[in-house]
Amino acid sequence: MNFDLPGTGTDQSPVFLNAADCRAWLARMPLANATQAQPMISRQINLLHRFALPPTERFAILESLRGPLSEVQDAAARQFAGKPLPLAPDEQAALDGTLGVWHLLALGYLRCFAALCVADDGRAPAPALLAQRTLSVFADWQVDLCRGQQLPDASYWKKLNQVFSAAETLGISGSAVGDPVRHGNLPTSALAAYAECTLLTTANLYELPARHLAWVARWARRWGAKLALLKAPPEDIRSRAVPLWVDLESDRPASYVPQSTTSGLWLDTTELRKSLLARVVLLEQGRAPAELQLGDDVTQPAAGQLLQRVLQRWCKGGTPRRHERHSASGGCGLIAGFEAVHFQLSGRRPFHAPSRDTATLRREREQFEVFGVRRQSVPDIMKQADSPVEAWQVADDWHLLNESATGLRITRPFVHGGRVGAGLLIAVRMPGSLHFTLGSLRWALRESSESLAAGIQLFPGEARPVAVRIVESGDARGPWLQGFLLPGIAALDEPASVIVPAGTFRIDRGIEAMVDQQMQAFKLLRVLDHGLEFERCSI
């Protein structure tokens, strides 16, 4: 069994050579300070990985490190999780350090697994435990890759598939083992850890905000044990989930599209589907997420929405595209951020809350009818002249990769341009167009050291920048805020909508909008789209 591991020697040893010394060393470490502790631990794991030790002793040391190390890694991840790309230098350093530690820990368990599998006949518990530990580190590694808006590369999937293939060959992939660090008192297995990695990749974690990513990662860990391994696909899937297919000899993750190969296996998610559907129903009946073992920090309605999302991706064959996507090319301009988009679509004029009374508005309309222009007061002109946003250079240059009627995939050099992240309101100007189209940045990924890619959902219709405010009970009104109106499009079955700041929506909430110096009133009916900073609501 060859995992392409570097050789070992005795030239430079870590500060501990047995589990007891390792625990004593950890007791002296500043584990509460991830910035200090992580590089110190990383150096010792690197030395341990290259130092010759009996595999049983190496395994005992890794087990002593694993619990405290997981807490340090969780603390370090808070520095980069959910942050826009490119990361700031301190955020990038935290990400690099975190991924480096997971890589070294995975290699350490791999070394133990390879050595003990050769020496053992497969009937002892050691190989089953080692396979589960190795695969579980790969799962933690994948979660932090997605938190840093990266995807596992081919070498990751090759090693993951190799380990699980070896566990299958030894007949221990489904053997129950304990893992107090990740599963408490519940039993787990190598198959459950491998299934967890599969659930993580099919969930497209990088599209989620940091809080929701943590929920789905927790669910994948908890429910990986519900997946079953099949040698052949089910003959009749009418009452079953759509199985995932994986080639254990490949360097690719599982998918719903089987290929012609002799090393393919299927992962059946039928039991998981039953569990998800039951939870969705109970949430709709008013049960609390914590009662359904979704987590004490999980809230509604986000819990139900996320369960529906993973149900589609884990059990129903993935999410089909509404419109066919095809290759495209050309440069496009992108503006990211609610305020910047409003500024650009307003003719690069800064936002000022409407403050004139009804009589003033009537007089200005009369002036417009007579003179053809709206006269501005001296304070209005002075406010615009003093506004710093007029100097904004808010449009970044991107390159179009593919497109559909409702979406785009674009790319740009990684370090050039502003920071972008999932959930931002954006405006994009397509090749050959003079106008911007409004949309949402669905995801952003660092594809290499030099490339940043992003996926965009386009909103139909020509957006109109307006001022909006909430109508409270009685005569109370909220402050004027930036917003956008989008027309209804009957051919696309798209209702008229308004884009408001996140947190505005309530069913039947009254909204007023100032449009061309005229007040319009309407009610919010339902949320059509939402992001970190906006909600698009039908009216």
Give residue ranges: language-model regions:
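Context-gated lysine
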Residues: 83, 158-159, 226, 231, ...
